[in-house]
Amino acid sequence: MKYYAAFALLLVACQPDQPAATTKPATAAPSNAAEPSARPPADTLHVADSLGHPAGVLRLRPSTKAAFDQLRAADPLPQRPAEREEAAVASGQKAPANLDAPLPADGRVQRRGETLVFRPAQGPAVTLRPVPSSPDGPEGNDIGYAYWGSLPAAHQWVVDVTTDEGPAVLLLDQRTGRRTDLLGAPALSPDGRYLLSVCEDVASGGTPTEMSLYRVDGPIPQLVWNRALGDWGPRYARWRDARHVVLALAHAAPSGDVAEGAGLPLTYAELELPATR
């Protein structure tokens, strides 16, 4: 299964903008500078729906790491399983054999060896098994699954997916077992109506960099808009309220060097979503 082919049409819907507020780290104001009386001016990003039709204008304003950190408790998901594995390897530890987050106590999600089993309220159980790589491919699995967590307000289980093309995310509906494929990490709005998916790989460009908004208060997640990005992109997203999200942004190096880009610091911006019905 190719996760990225399904998103190809979405990613070409519009060309990436280059908002000044997000492409360079903010410089500190002098200590004697007057406190601004109004919010800084916003940069804009135009977004499109699944057919490429205009779906609104996003506004971005500079934010801070402190503002992002204050919203940590609002994130219902633990650290991503793949990131825990990377952290263990980077610290010289052996990567855990089982990357699952703690499974729900109600027994509706079970790990049986390499297989994950989900039991929705209606319909048959959903079984996820790793897909082995082809004999002439690299060692390991082409597709692997780890339980990431639950979004009860949206009635979704979240699965971290590793593929031969890069990371992805799978949502499984806790009511019906219906699957929804995402490219990026999901962040659920405080009112449980919307889910923002962010995917970032600006350093190497090996996977798409984009963000997508889904409406999740109905029977199935519905794509509202999608936005492809260029030399900057959101690595993490945390909602402040029903229309504002603080983003941690990664940046590509001006030289295009991957190692240099990986060493650039994150910057922060607040995203204001267009009004939706």
Regions found by a protein language model. Give the residues of each.
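Sec-dependent bacterial lipoprotein signal peptides
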Residues: 1-12
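Short coil/turn segments at the loop-to-beta-strand junctions that recur within blades
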Residues: 178-188, 228-234
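Beta-strand C-termini and the immediately following turn/loop, strongest in propeller blades
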Residues: 159-164, 197-209, 247-253
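Hydrophilic extracytoplasmic domains
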Residues: 235-277
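Terminal domain-start segments
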Residues: 30-157
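Blade-terminus and WD-like Trp-Asp/Gly-His loop motifs, strongest in beta-propeller folds
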Residues: 109-111, 148-154, 186-197, 236-245
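Bacterial signal peptide processing site
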Residues: 14-17
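Surface-exposed loop/turn elements that mediate protein-protein interactions on large endomembrane-trafficking
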Residues: 78, 115-137, 164-181, 209-225, ...
